[in-house]
């Protein structure tokens, strides 16, 4: 029987459903929330996401990229705004064609749902909150918007219900998986930067206002407005708890983000009206029960958003699952353990890299030594493209497994430390000495690749 039940009709669940429907499966998607296409908000979740190579590859394989291109905005570099008004720029890639893309979560989700609705072998169910799961008898119970309970049986179940996954929690309660959700001491809040006031800000850039223990981030929108995300401690000094009145809020933004503040006419209403989002990392093992239940996306491996890889790694799950179903002729008893073994090591790696990047963009990004290393790294990629490709480029602009990219990045950190140790300016570099170090690096790299 080729029937699949997917819990969660967000980004990962809907794309997974499209992949499986293409394989001939009868797919039912159950979503606890109302249909996002008919809802005015995105339930307080992060509105803008970063789409890069891994996500693009997964969408392209489903012939969706041409339509997705219409709703995303290129981000060609970081624009780093200092408190004194200075702005510095750091390209993401090696050349003009390497950039990431800002995309609205709700717009992308709506596009995927529209595609799913057109598939005759996909059924969509909204306002169906998972109430209970009988994993041994393959039965599920939902609560609908009227408070009534609806029971159903399933043949095979996929949990794609995000970081607060009920499927994962129910598997954990049965002793089938071990799982934890670790929260950062920081949260985030969505704030808007009006298009009327963004004329002085670079278009097609990811805007960053890093301030050591907190940060404002801005993603561009198609209408030239910017969607901001304020990342701030939940408690203590410079925290959401401390900014508890309008006077404190105005003073904080005037002092810390003066150029952004001037472009935020709705700051007070949005700050006190929008929910504060949580940031967490999910650890779970295994992700499956026999060949009958599988977790994907944030439900299995949710991460903090500071490498822009949450959606991309979830979409990569969908593509790799499809490839394994090809390889093993849809034998799920072989696919599920191999999928877990392949993905777990890589999603653990991107979780660690995301945490490292969290520290990088909060404080390191303005450190003179860090800036020098980035300058040298860029020059290494230009001079020796066959020898040196940075970890960031491997993560964002290739499909290199995350674990391999991380191992290469650790090797590169050592190389850059050696190159930078005696100098304070890139003009002081002795390129003959650099080439000697690069030769040693190449030998170590060969063992990883």
From Swiss-Prot:
Keyword entries, A-Z: FAD, Flavoprotein, Monooxygenase, NADP, Oxidoreductase, Pyridine nucleotide biosynthesis
Q: What protein does this entry describe?
A: Kynurenine 3-monooxygenase
Task: List the EC numbers from the record.
Answer: 1.14.13.9
Instruction: Name the Gene Ontology molecular function terms of this record.
Output: FAD binding; kynurenine 3-monooxygenase activity
Q: Which reaction does it catalyse?
A: L-kynurenine + NADPH + O2 + H(+) = 3-hydroxy-L-kynurenine + NADP(+) + H2O
What superkingdom heads the lineage?
A: Bacteria
EC supergroup of this enzyme: oxidoreductase
Give the record's GO biological process terms: anthranilate metabolic process; kynurenine metabolic process; L-tryptophan catabolic process; NAD biosynthetic process; quinolinate biosynthetic process
Please explain the role this protein plays, according to its UniProt record.
Catalyzes the hydroxylation of L-kynurenine (L-Kyn) to form 3-hydroxy-L-kynurenine (L-3OHKyn). Required for synthesis of quinolinic acid.
Quick one: which pathway?
Cofactor biosynthesis; NAD(+) biosynthesis; quinolinate from L-kynurenine: step 1/3
Q: Which cofactor does it need?
A: FAD
Q: Name one Pfam family in it.
A: FAD_binding_3
Q: Which family does it belong to?
A: Belongs to the aromatic-ring hydroxylase family. KMO subfamily.
By its UniProt entry, which InterPro entries does this protein fall under? FAD-bd, FAD/NAD-bd_sf, Kynurenine_monooxygenase
